[in-house]
């Protein structure tokens, strides 16, 4: 059978027309040096700062140094799998982590991989760990409270949604306890929580997770763990990864709380990386951009304006001090970035005042606007009276003769201190806090022994639940202590006081 020449040309023309000329190009480089979790790579001329690269063993790395001939990459995996001469590919993507509701109730590493043995996670997508903070025009002032459930904080150092409030103090003063209590108190309040553990002992993280599970808080919480055994690179990216997971919810109009525990160890991890990358050291051997390290992280916390969904991301960074020195490099940096600090003191802790908050050095710069009306009314004089008591306490130690007015301040101060003491994992509802403060500030417990003040107030709250539930309901609904409710409350306190006195006489 003969083939006509014109058929051949048409078949060839068709083949040429349908031929796929597209070429897939990949930029590759080679590892020329590897050690201490750092790889130097030759050949990735167009690599971008913060970009993910992939080694031939499947391990990923992140570009942190751009030099004349080489690129410095931190290895985010097993560094032993990275050898000299290995081929490295660019991914063209900035370092990103999985995000979404599938992460709630799970413990993950900073790459978003599950480490709790509960199987794979269903993600909603991925988000870059570094993203610009919302600009001023997209923000609105902090005006909604984030209740911690801790009376001393909610009354004197209130935190608003979208605020950054530093928790600072020496080791073993209860910093993590305040953060965990705050997470537990968000139950049924529609706030998603992210707890980022940086450089903590694995046993400590396991204990926090068990506590959160015990109190039913894990269902709305994600734990991002970069324990002390992880590489400095993973500890460095952990808070950014946790922040990205929180931002996903914030941009959906939800409220998020992120705890960074703690940024002192984060700065140490970054110092380790910087020195290994041969960057010049500065004060306390930290690199020159250690301020920017924390400012770009904490500036991502915001209360978005209503046209952008009205979501919020509240940050509770934790910083550990040495011997109470808050004027060291990292503490002063983070104090200047945040909107206030809760300062915990060893002396108070060991004298049995827990949470050990030094009210004189603690402050909330923007939270006052977020307090509910009822709390503003009853707690206005609380800080002042407590400060006066602490001042006069010094003179009382000398046993000198004190006048009646001074004795009155001391008596009242002792009773205020008693209601600010609170057992761990027992957050108080805001209406209970208002009633407790009202009772003490209006001198209803002046004639009660100091050791009996807390049992009296707790008994009163229980009595109100049973006999006058409408008082608490009114405060809860109106967020105010109306004249009518106040009259009812006064009568109820006096009624309970009579019962209490009669019980004591028996």
Curated annotation (Swiss-Prot):
Protein name in UniProt? ATP synthase subunit alpha
Membrane disposition? Peripheral membrane protein
Q: Give residues annotated as binding ATP.
A: 169-176
The family database entries (NCBIfam families) matched by this protein are listed as:
atpA, PRK13343.1
Per the record, GO CC terms? plasma membrane; proton-transporting ATP synthase complex
* Reaction catalysed by this enzyme: ATP + H2O + 4 H(+)(in) = ADP + phosphate + 5 H(+)(out)
- Protein role: Produces ATP from ADP in the presence of a proton gradient across the membrane. The alpha chain is a regulatory subunit.
Protein location: Cell membrane
Q: Where is the composition biased (Basic and acidic residues)?
A: 119-129
Q: Which InterPro entries match?
A: ATP_synth_asu-like_sf, ATP_synth_asu_C, ATP_synth_asu_C_sf, ATP_synth_F1_a_nt-bd_dom, ATP_synth_F1_asu, ATPase_a/bsu_AS, ATPase_F1/V1/A1_a/bsu_N, ATPase_F1/V1/A1_a/bsu_N_sf
Task: Name the protein family.
Answer: Belongs to the ATPase alpha/beta chains family.
Which key words are in the record?
A: ATP synthesis, ATP-binding, Cell membrane, CF(1), Hydrogen ion transport, Ion transport, Membrane, Nucleotide-binding, Translocase, Transport
Q: Name one GO molecular function term.
A: ADP binding
Q: Name one Pfam family in it.
A: ATP-synt_ab_N
For the site labelled Required for activity, the residues are 362
| The keyword Ribosomal protein is assigned to this record | no
Q: Where in this protein does the record put region Disordered?
A: 119-138
Tree of life domain: Bacteria
Assembly and partners are described as: F-type ATPases have 2 components, CF(1) - the catalytic core - and CF(0) - the membrane proton channel. CF(1) has five subunits: alpha(3), beta(3), gamma(1), delta(1), epsilon(1). CF(0) has three main subunits: a(1), b(2) and c(9-12). The alpha and beta chains form an alternating ring which encloses part of the gamma chain. CF(1) is attached to CF(0) by a central stalk formed by the gamma and epsilon chains, while a peripheral stalk is formed by the delta and b chains.
User: What PANTHER family does the database record attribute to this sequence?
Assistant: ATP SYNTHASE SUBUNIT ALPHA, MITOCHONDRIAL
Q: What is its EC number?
A: 7.1.2.2
Q: What is the lineage of its organism?
A: Bacteria, Bacillati, Bacillota, Clostridia, Thermoanaerobacterales
